[in-house]
Amino acid sequence: MFSPDQENHPSKAPVKYGELIVLGYNGSLPNGDRGRRKSRFALFKRPKANGVKPSTVHIACTPQAAKAISNKDQHSISYTLSRAQTVVVEYTHDSNTDMFQIGRSTESPIDFVVTDTVPGSQSNSDTQSVQSTISRFACRIICERSPPFTARIYAAGFDSSKNIFLGEKAAKWKTSDGQMDGLTTNGVLVMHPRNGFTEDSKPGIWREISVCGNVFSLRETRSAQQRGKMVEIETNQLQDGSLIDLCGATLLWRTAEGLSHTPTVKHLEALRQEINAARPQCPVGFNTLAFPSMKRKDVVDEKQPWVYLNCGHVHGYHNWGNKEERDGKDRECPMCRSVGPYVPLWLGCEAGFYVDAGPPTHAFSPCGHVCSEKTTAYWSQIPLPHGTHTFHAACPFCAHQLAGEQGYIRLIFQGPLD
């Protein structure tokens, strides 16, 4: 550890609170990471604290008075109760915390710009036509500047005027201690895994987080007026592996400590080379198969392994058993004659999604993303929010809904014959 005189040494690496990783991207956005819009965002201790905490509450404001308070050069949250009455809560500087804001807006208060994830999209243009359901100022994360650097999540973010407005139609209420609280239109949902983010992890229960960071059971639908029941024994404190859903994109929170136990990209590359060094062969063409470099994630290579998803037999690409009368991608496996989808295999390159450092022996179905057995087993159990009131398991590397009984398959490679 550092000795006290090193604490303020300028060359000391900045403290990392954790990282947010967007589900559905395999290491980077399709057209590359740019500025505040990327697939992974690291939260570091700021040179100067920018956190805020609630202070003065103004009750029974007229709209004009509320506007005057909101126009002051400090943060505030306005709760519109009726056309004649607004409650404004002023927020004051908190020197003990750092604030990070996430949303769809590209305005300067947003630290991490997140847009809707389209399953399996290969370019940002695929996402442009979609009507976004992510809030412009979706949520904020407040991190304590001193150990253990606790991170807490709150619904809604402050806009360029340092305000959060909850209009007449937003769900809002007065709490038992006389404070105000509310929910955003489509809500911010959080799920904390049981047993942390490890090979023993199990899914937790999805909850909704309020503007003040309280925890509620889910509403009947995403934007219903009626809030769920308050869950007093749970908190808005993020833990390693917590999932944050913004209604259009889901983020994985990894703590700095958790990431230190996660396989590195270098480790995943070594596993790729190890598989290729074993020279797996296509049982039909006897040609050697090889997983392409991790930098090439969307163009099928001629040596690329393909798999029959019903049985797991790995082949090179060939036309054997391709009968025209069959629908779509269904093919008959030459090894065992089972009929099912036949897809190329892709290595999962986003190391933050792995729950262990095991070899890439299993693939998600139907997309063909390959990773460790424990990682496929974990993600296949996680019900991810989809639309306004449904949930389904999806591949973390591309966001495709999983298919089949398990949602993943064990790969059966044929070794070289020599």
Curated annotation (Swiss-Prot):
Keywords: Chromosome, DNA damage, DNA repair, Phosphoprotein, Transferase, Ubl conjugation, Ubl conjugation pathway. One of its GO terms (molecular function) is ubiquitin-protein transferase activity. It catalyses: S-ubiquitinyl-[E2 ubiquitin-conjugating enzyme]-L-cysteine + [acceptor protein]-L-lysine = [E2 ubiquitin-conjugating enzyme]-L-cysteine + N(6)-ubiquitinyl-[acceptor protein]-L-lysine. The gene is Peli1. The modification Phosphothreonine is found at T127. GO terms for biological process: DNA repair; negative regulation of necroptotic process; negative regulation of T cell activation; negative regulation of T cell proliferation; negative regulation of TORC1 signaling; positive regulation of B cell activation; positive regulation of B cell proliferation; positive regulation of canonical NF-kappaB signal transduction. Residues 311-399 are annotated as: Ring-like domain. Its EC number is 2.3.2.27. Pathway: Protein modification; protein ubiquitination. It comes from the Eukaryota. It holds the Pfam family Pellino_RING. GO terms for cellular component: nucleus; site of double-strand break. InterPro entries: Pellino_fam (IPR006800), Pellino_FHA (IPR048334), Pellino_RING (IPR048335). PANTHER family: E3 UBIQUITIN-PROTEIN LIGASE PELLINO HOMOLOG 1 (PTHR12098:SF4), E3 UBIQUITIN-PROTEIN LIGASE PELLINO-RELATED (PTHR12098). Interacts with MAP3K7. Upon IL1B treatment, forms a complex with TRAF6, IRAK1, IRAK4 and MYD88; this complex recruits MAP3K7/TAK1, TAB1 and TAB2 to mediate NF-kappa-B activation. Direct binding of SMAD6 to PELI1 prevents the complex formation and hence negatively regulates IL1R-TLR signaling and eventually NF-kappa-B-mediated gene expression. Interacts (via atypical FHA domain) with RIPK3. Binds preferentially to the 'Thr-182' phosphorylated form of RIPK3. Interacts with RIPK1. Disruption phenotype: Peli1 deficiency suppresses inflammation-induced neuron death in substantia nigra. Promotes antitumor immunity in different mouse tumor models. In addition, Peli1 deficiency alleviates inflammation and reduces serum IL-1beta. Residues 13-200 form the FHA domain. E3 ubiquitin ligase catalyzing the covalent attachment of ubiquitin moieties onto substrate proteins. Involved in the TLR and IL-1 signaling pathways via interaction with the complex containing IRAK kinases and TRAF6. Acts as a positive regulator of inflammatory response in microglia through activation of NF-kappa-B and MAP kinase. Mediates 'Lys-63'-linked polyubiquitination of IRAK1 allowing subsequent NF-kappa-B activation. Conjugates 'Lys-63'-linked ubiquitin chains to the adapter protein ASC/PYCARD, which in turn is crucial for NLRP3 inflammasome activation. This is E3 ubiquitin-protein ligase pellino homolog 1.
